[in-house]
Regions:
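Extended C-terminal subregions enriched in glycine
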Residues: 289-308, 312
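Short intrinsically disordered, low-complexity coil segments enriched in acidic
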Residues: 1-4, 67
Length: 384
């Protein structure tokens, strides 16, 4: 028993301080550097940011943006391409690698991928071995040629043509969603992203399972909705509209931002301003506005370094075959690798592969640079 309450309190305080000191130097909480009078500045000091969609963190190191670069540089060929290339497997009227002849299409053209990653008739198989677990999967894969023009990428197409691409995406969702649980629409633009053919095109992969990224996004949005009674991404849109420091393009119905938790240098997240679980639920007005926003966003990308800006982009929305979709909000991710110029890209290696994602430029700095650029494509501006 303690005879003096004040002494007991002092002893307890000393004990707590000793425990805290022990924890500090055992690595649980690193000791302060001693610079206690320096205020934290997110534009100068390293910090972590949380991605609520993926339940993951990214290390932000803005002080590293000044480091010199003597590493690999990309080869850039920005020579304008012809509207039709006789040797291209995707141009109208040409023969594809498998021997099929493309029609003389004038709108977006969809055909089965000649080298699909998924097959619809895979035999049943499942192993529940705790160390060697596996399962057979089924699916299908298609290619979408955006237009017959071999030389014009998405930002160089007029909004009316981009609307036909959006309509094609929606048609693919409706058709493939009747059978498959997940339909992934995406585009790999540019050789830096592994694009195997320069003719502007995207892909559709449909599967009977939820891929990892989607499963995590589904779980995160569901948990947020259950805890708050609201959509995670709708709340996030409201926050971005209020703060405005990360907005790149704003339309009547759509908003493109560099997300607070961005990993890639000029990564963007494209979201509707109103509840929209799937892109296929978009109204004609929303589709029209989306075409305008897509053109403005991708034009800013190209204008950043006056080059055809490489990226991987793709759409996420509520999976098919489930009635519970209130927690979902459709959105598109743009993941571009370029960092300092048209020839220097970010590499996901070392720490990023072994520990966690890391970036130098803050999301706010990246958004400011993109936002300040003209929304008219540099080639269109030169032709005026």
């Amino acid at each position: 028993a303690c005879l003096e309450p004040s002494m007991c309190a002092e002893m307890a305080c000393q004990s707590a301080h000793k425990m805290a000191t022990s924890e500090t130097f055992s690595g649980l909480s690193p000791p302060a550097s001693g610079a206690t009078n320096i205020m934290f500045d997110p534009t100068e000091h390293p910090h972590r940011r949380y991605n609520p969609l993926q339940d993951s963190w990214v290390l932000v190191s803005p002080h590293r943006a000044r480091r010199p670069w003597q590493g690999q540089q990309e080869n850039v060929d920005d020579t304008p391409r012809p509207s039709h290339d006789p040797s291209c497997y995707l141009c109208p009227g040409n023969t594809r690698i498998g021997g099929e002849v493309n029609p003389d299409y004038t709108q977006p053209y969809v055909f089965p991928n000649d080298f699909p990653a998924l097959l619809p008739d895979t035999p049943e198989y499942r192993s529940d071995d705790p160390l060697l677990k596996s399962m057979a999967v089924r699916g299908t894969a298609r290619v979408i040629c955006f237009s017959p023009d071999h030389g014009k990428t998405l930002p160089e197409l007029p909004p009316a043509v981009i609307e036909t691409i959006i309509a094609t995406w929606i048609q693919q969702y409706r058709e493939l969603g009747e059978r498959w649980r997940w339909v992934q629409i995406f585009e790999n633009k540019g050789a830096a992203m592994g694009c195997s053919n320069p003719h502007p095109h995207g892909q559709v992969w449909a599967s009977d399972f939820l891929p990892n990224e989607v499963a995590r996004a589904d779980d995160s949005q569901r948990r947020y909705f259950q805890a708050n009674g609201r959509s995670l991404l709708l709340d996030y849109v409201e926050r971005e509209l209020k703060e405005r420091s990360r907005i790149v393009v704003e339309g009547e119905h759509w908003l493109a931002v560099v997300p607070y938790w961005a990993v890639w240098p000029f990564e963007t997240l494209l979201m509707p301003k109103a509840a929209l679980p799937r892109l296929m639920d978009a109204t004609p007005e929303q589709q029209k506005d989306l075409a305008i926003v897509l053109k403005k966003l991708t034009s800013r990308y190209d204008n950043l370094f006056h080059t055809s800006f490489p990226y991987s982009m793709g759409w996420h929305g509520a999976p098919f075959g489930q009635e519970d979709t209130a927690h979902w909000q459709c959105h598109a991710h743009f993941y571009p690798p370029l960092l300092r110029s048209a020839t220097v890209k970010k590499f996901m290696v070392g720490y990023e592969m072994l520990a966690e994602s890391q970036r130098d430029l803050t999301a706010e700095q990246a958004a400011e640079r993109l936002r300040a650029l003209p929304e008219v494509h540099y080639r269109e501006a030169a032709d005026r």
